């Protein structure tokens, strides 16, 4: 509760800074809003609702949308009309705002003009952006004097991100990096292994000569001789035996002949 002042009066209440608080619309503004309502319905909501309703109807009829088992395409058509109504109202807001801004001596039009220009009390900054900007101001941003650090008191102390491993003292007897273990006692280090001599490279002439020698050896092999076709077999013609000179062959009544 507000405590009374020394003279018994109460402090004045803090006024709301919103420019449209307890705002009374003028007759011209009410007329403009009614015209906007009628025009948005006739010019936007009615065409959009009719179009979406027809699309829903033909979609159910042609099988693109699934209709209701009892009411058919009616639910889809109603949803299309309602969606078109709200889309039309929303799309006409900018044109309605321009009509109100053209009114003379209109406080609502002045507020809309300030909002479009980005000035005044009402601007286009969202609540999230306003909160972000408020926390980046000087009262919320830490200064160098407010941040506590002990680096100046003990600058020689090494941290987890600044380790001085090269200047630390090491003992020769404790350095077991290259000390042989039981598993590698009989093995030499990689640096002590003898390197194989480099093989001389082969030239094109050497490869050509080697290829010719391999081809000649392949030709001399008995299994690599070319296939020779066999000579065709000639058939001997059998000469018919001459008939006996003596006597004519005997024939029966069927025309068969034989010799005695």
Swiss-Prot record:
Residues 1-110 form the OCIA domain. Residues 155-164 have a biased composition (Polar residues). Residues 146-260 are annotated as: Disordered. It holds the Pfam family OCIA. GO terms for cellular component: endosome. InterPro entries: OCAD1/2, OCIA_dom. It comes from the Eukaryota. Residues 205-215 have a biased composition (Basic and acidic residues). Belongs to the OCIAD1 family. PANTHER family: OCIA DOMAIN-CONTAINING PROTEIN 1, OVARIAN CARCINOMA IMMUNOREACTIVE ANTIGEN. This is OCIA domain-containing protein 1. It comes from Drosophila pseudoobscura pseudoobscura (Fruit fly). The lineage of its organism: Eukaryota, Metazoa, Ecdysozoa, Arthropoda, Hexapoda.
């Amino acid at each position: 509760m507000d405590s009374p002042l020394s003279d018994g009066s109460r402090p004045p209440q803090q006024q709301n800074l919103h420019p449209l608080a307890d705002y009374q619309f003028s007759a011209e503004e009410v007329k403009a809003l009614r015209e906007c309502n009628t025009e948005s319905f006739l010019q936007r909501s009615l065409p959009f609702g009719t179009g979406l309703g027809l699309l829903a109807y033909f979609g159910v009829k042609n099988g693109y949308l699934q209709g209701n088992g009892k009411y058919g395409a009616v639910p889809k058509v109603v949803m299309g009309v309602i969606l078109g109504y709200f889309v039309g109202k929303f799309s006409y807001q900018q044109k309605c705002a321009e009509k109100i801004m053209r009114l003379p001596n209109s406080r609502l039009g002045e507020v809309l003009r300030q909002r479009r220009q980005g000035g005044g009390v009402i601007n286009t900054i969202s609540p999230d952006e306003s909160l972000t900007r408020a926390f980046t101001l000087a009262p919320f941003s830490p200064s160098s004097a407010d941040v506590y650090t002990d680096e100046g008191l003990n600058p020689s102390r090494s941290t987890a991100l600044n380790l001085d491993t090269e200047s630390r003292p090491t003992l020769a007897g404790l350095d077991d990096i290259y000390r042989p273990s039981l598993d590698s006692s009989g093995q030499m280090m990689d640096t002590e292994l003898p390197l194989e001599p480099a093989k001389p490279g082969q030239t094109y002439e050497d490869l050509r000569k080697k290829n010719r020698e391999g081809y000649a050896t392949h030709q001399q092999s008995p299994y690599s001789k070319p296939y020779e076709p066999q000579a065709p077999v000639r058939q001997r013609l059998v000469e018919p035996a001459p008939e006996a000179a003596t006597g004519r062959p005997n024939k029966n009544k069927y025309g068969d002949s034989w010799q005695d």
